[in-house]
C-alpha cells in the first residue's frame, strides 16, 4: 500500500486535485482510501456525489467511544473509501490535534488492514506545514510520499518551499520523501517553466502541469469529479495523466528548500517580481 499526502497552500486546489487524481487511479482499477485532514471536511465530497459526510471528530463527540468503522468511512466513486477527520468547534481546541486523534482511531478500527486490499491511501492535508498536527502524516510515517500542489503565484511557491522544510525536518526519522510538485495552473506568465525550475532547484520534478479549465468548477457544481461528470472531456485526460504519473513515479527525494533570497531571485528571473 502506497501512503501519499497532498500538501499545498490553502485555496490552491488540493482537495479538487486529490479527488480528481483519485478518480483517475480508481478508474485504473486501484483501491484507494482518502483521508481528509482539513477541518472544512471537503476532501471527499466529489467522490461521494456531494455528500458532506459526518467527520470522525463529530462522530466521536456524538457517539463517544462506541464508534464503528462503518460510522466514519463511506464508499464513493468506484469503491473509493472516504473519511474526514474534521476539526474542533470553531474557536476551541486545535485542528492539528484532531488529525492525530482521527488517524489513530482509523488505525485502531482496522481501516488500513489487509482485508480492504488498499493500493493507496491519500491524505489531503490543510495548507502549510505550520503546526505539528498538520505535519503528523509526515512526522509519524503515516505518509511516505508527498506531492505539493502549487502554482506560479508567489505565495503558493513560498508555501511549497516551506512544506519542503517540513519534509526535510522529518525525512530521516519518518522516511518520508517528496514525489514532486503538481502545478495547478493559475495562468501566471511563464508558469510552467517557472515551476519546472523551482522543482529543479529543490531537487525534485514537476510531475504534472494541470491547465486551468472552468470545466473543473462545472463538475464541482454538479458534485462530481471531472472523470465522473464527463469522462470524454480533455480535462479528464489531464487528471488521468497525473494519476498515471503518480502511479509510475520512481523519483522520491529529500528536498533542498531554497533560501528566501533564492526564491525571490527565481521570481525576478521569470518576471513575476521586480
Swiss-Prot record:
Belongs to the NifH/BchL/ChlL family. [4Fe-4S] cluster binds at residues 94, 131. GO terms for molecular function: 4 iron, 4 sulfur cluster binding; ATP binding; metal ion binding; nitrogenase activity. Pfam families: Fer4_NifH. The reversible ADP-ribosylation of Arg-97 inactivates the nitrogenase reductase and regulates nitrogenase activity. It comes from Chlorobium phaeobacteroides (strain DSM 266 / SMG 266 / 2430). The key enzymatic reactions in nitrogen fixation are catalyzed by the nitrogenase complex, which has 2 components: the iron protein and the molybdenum-iron protein. Its EC number is 1.18.6.1. It catalyses: N2 + 8 reduced [2Fe-2S]-[ferredoxin] + 16 ATP + 16 H2O = H2 + 8 oxidized [2Fe-2S]-[ferredoxin] + 2 NH4(+) + 16 ADP + 16 phosphate + 6 H(+). Homodimer. CDD domains: NifH. This is Nitrogenase iron protein. The modification ADP-ribosylarginine is found at residue 97. Binds 1 [4Fe-4S] cluster per dimer. GO terms for biological process: nitrogen fixation. It is an enzyme of class 1 (oxidoreductase). PROSITE patterns: NIFH_FRXC_1, NIFH_FRXC_2, NIFH_FRXC_3. HAMAP family: NifH (MF_00533). Its cofactor is [4Fe-4S] cluster. Keywords: 4Fe-4S, ADP-ribosylation, ATP-binding, Iron, Iron-sulfur, Metal-binding, Nitrogen fixation, Nucleotide-binding, Oxidoreductase. ATP binds at residues 8-15.
